[in-house]
Amino acid sequence: MASRNNCSSSGNCSSGSLRNTCHIPASSSIALCSTNMGCGEVFCVPSSCQDHTWFMDNCPETFAEPLSGQPPSREASGFENSCCSSTYCVPRHCQGSGYIPASSFISGSCLPASYRPVSYVSSSCRPVSPFMNNCRPVSCVSGGYRPLPCGSNSCRPLGIVTYGCRPSGCVTYGPQTIHIVSNSLRPLQPVCGGCQPSIPVFGTCRPSCSAQGGQ
């Protein structure tokens, strides 16, 4: 039974007759290999979420053990550089503000170092707010409106739309229903829960000259 290989802090792996070299990026602050990672498998290791970048760990990059003092020869099929299975995605703690590690990973979602997402890698870091894929709630800036909750993986238009905002105050134009006591002979002030119509409306029960006896 093959033993599990470990990456050393220097990025080199060793076990028996095979030796694997772990890819270390140019930035010294990012280390793609750790002592609890197996070198015989492909790992996708994220960098800090501050720059929203995932780096592909090119370990294993398999070399045959040198014979008779000859330099090692690189095998043709021992190099990975595009994607890896979600089984081997190993997240680090996200250091960026407003991000937390995701609980699960989507297969084939690991990105190479050259890919720079605008917001974040959705399979690795989630924002603290429940909005995914850079979605933001509608910003209803006009008075008397408030935004509806924005669901996950759904984007709202930037402008105010009828299904995106609910009126929270009185509309400043047009009268609402006016309640007038039917048996009153004097006009009453219109009442509509605080909203005043734009045009004064008087009651329909105003007395006429004939109703007053023409006196």
UniProtKB/Swiss-Prot annotation:
Decide whether keyword Iron is in the record. no
| UniProt entry tagged with the keyword Repeat | yes
* InterPro entries noted in UniProt: Keratin_matx, KRTAP_PMG
Entry GO CC: cytosol; keratin filament
Record keywords, A-Z: Keratin, Repeat
According to the UniProt record, which cysteines are disulfide-bonded? none
One of the entry's Gene Ontology molecular-function terms is: structural molecule activity
What is the protein's known function?
In the hair cortex, hair keratin intermediate filaments are embedded in an interfilamentous matrix, consisting of hair keratin-associated proteins (KRTAP), which are essential for the formation of a rigid and resistant hair shaft through their extensive disulfide bond cross-linking with abundant cysteine residues of hair keratins. The matrix proteins include the high-sulfur and high-glycine-tyrosine keratins.
Q: How does it assemble?
A: Interacts with hair keratins.
Give the UniProt family note. Answer: Belongs to the PMG family.
Q: Cite the PANTHER family for this sequence.
A: KERATIN ASSOCIATED PROTEIN 3-3-RELATED, KERATIN-ASSOCIATED PROTEIN 26-1
**Protein name (record):** Keratin-associated protein 26-1
- Organism the protein comes from: Mus musculus (Mouse)
Encoding gene, per UniProt annotation: Krtap26-1
